[in-house]
Design a protein with these regions (language model features):
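Hydrophobic, repeat-rich solenoid/adaptor surfaces of innate immune receptors and signaling proteins
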Residues: 11, 355-356
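Substrate-gating cap/lid region and adjacent catalytic-acid/histidine neighborhood
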Residues: 161, 165-342, 351, 358
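Mature extracytoplasmic/periplasmic domains
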Residues: 362-390
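Tryptophan-rich aromatic "cage" segments
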Residues: 385-407
Length: 407
């Protein structure tokens, strides 16, 4: 009823390998009802069915076989343009948003020429595609896979005689093809260049953008008791963050211990690892978007720690999703029963909806959220308190950047 509403198109996680838009946590009912938006969830071809690059070895017949998983997303966005008015949506106010692999999808779609004009805002949550898969890497993976199947380049039609189970079993059952590259391939056509390297994509220069991450992304991976011994922590910092330089690893550990004196070893490691991966990627996307000098971008950081498992998982990968969708009751196994979660869910879901409505996430129930600049790195912190902070991890960010430059 009334005026056409902003449209929010959700792209699920799973790293282009697995997942679905139908998970209960992604139910858009409350987001649509409370924030007066239309929510669309998308499922598409994944894994080897969505990202097997046959264009180079297969000739003309297979020329458009590349990136069909992402082509599905473009088709879905075109469907939204053609049909969303029938559902009360505004085709001129479409925002794509996604988490993990879904953040990779939104950031890569910004670099797809055929997607230009199909959306007007983009949000990447704990995921990004700064660089795509090169055609050489994709071709090498296909060759290993076809060799395992005993199929030659001029016999690609034989693939269509196989069952999906045979295709998957061969892929995952053969060490020779483990690590098969899955995701957007730089084919020179559908995706002409690396999405965000060396600069933000020009096709979406006028599209407002938001990106962020959670504080301890990997907290969902480690098994109980979620702890590391001192020697394990030193080894983790040395091999993963310090280019095998033990002195640098010790200096990083000291840096994080001084900032978080009450944190266990495991939580310190998870915080540093997330700073060096998902958080760095979100900051980098915002930097590149800012340097483009067109539409604004906004940086956030989710650092509310779940009480589940005695707070030992921290602010882990996927934890922000029920707050964005205002589904904290549906996801009580993730969020626990803290009453504050309702307040945080309101603030976050309203910010995401405000961004979809106007390209600006600000609303009356939160502090002023300034657009990103490289001078101040303004960041909206969603934690036990919602607050706007300039460059909250500056010291750690610069220390990790210095190590990166040595690699």
């Amino acid at each position: 009823n009334g005026d056409p509403k902003p449209v929010m198109v959700w792209m699920h996680g799973g790293g282009h390998r697995y997942g679905s838009g139908n998970y209960l946590m992604y139910d858009g009912t409350l987001l649509a009802k409370k924030e007066d938006v239309v929510v669309v969830s998308v499922s598409h071809r994944l894994n080897i069915f969505g990202y097997m690059h046959l264009a180079d070895i297969g000739g003309d017949k297979w020329a458009e076989s590349t990136n069909v998983g992402t082509q599905d997303l473009v088709a879905a966005l075109q469907w939204v343009q053609d049909n969303i008015e029938e559902f009360g949506g505004d085709p001129d106010r479409v925002t794509i948003f996604g988490q993990s692999g879904g953040g990779g999808k939104t950031s890569s779609l910004m670099a797809v020429p055929s997607a230009a004009g199909l959306f007007h805002g983009a949000i990447a949550q704990s995921g990004s595609t700064i660089r795509g898969i090169t055609s050489d890497t994709a071709n090498a993976g296909v060759e290993r896979y076809l060799n395992k199947l005993g199929i030659k380049a001029n016999q690609l039609d034989r693939l269509q005689a196989l069952t999906p189970q045979q295709i998957e079993t061969t892929l995952y059952g053969a060490p020779a093809v483990q690590g098969f590259p899955m995701g957007p391939v730089i084919d020179g056509n559908f995706i002409p260049r690396h999405p965000w390297d060396p600069s933000a994509p020009s096709y979406s220069s006028e599209v407002p953008f938001m990106a962020g991450s959670t504080e301890t992304e990997g907290g969902w991976i480690g098994p109980p008791p979620y702890e590391l011994a001192d020697v394990d922590m030193l080894e983790s910092f040395r091999t993963a963050l310090s280019n095998n330089n033990e002195q640098q690893a010790k200096e990083l550990i000291s840096l994080y211990q001084s900032k978080f004196p009450d944190r266990r070893n495991q939580m310190l490691w998870l915080t540093a690892a997330a700073d060096n991966s998902a958080r760095w990627n979100a900051q980098e996307l915002n930097r590149l978007k800012y340097e483009q000098g067109s539409a604004p971008s906004y940086l956030y950081f989710f650092n509310w720690h779940s009480p589940v498992h005695d707070y030992r998982m921290g602010s882990y990968h996927t934890l922000e999703i029920p707050f964005v969708f205002n589904n904290v009751d549906v996801a009580a196994s993730m969020t626990g029963a803290d009453s504050y979660r309702y307040e945080l869910a309101h603030v976050m879901s309203a910010a995401w909806a405000a961004f979809a409505r106007t390209g600006d996430p600000n609303h009356v129930d939160m502090p002023t959220w300034a657009p990103f600049t490289t001078e101040n790195y303004p960041t909206m912190m969603f934690g036990d308190e919602v607050m706007a902070v300039n460059d909250p991890n500056r010291v750690e960010r610069l220390a990790l950047a210095a190590i990166r430059q040595q690699a």
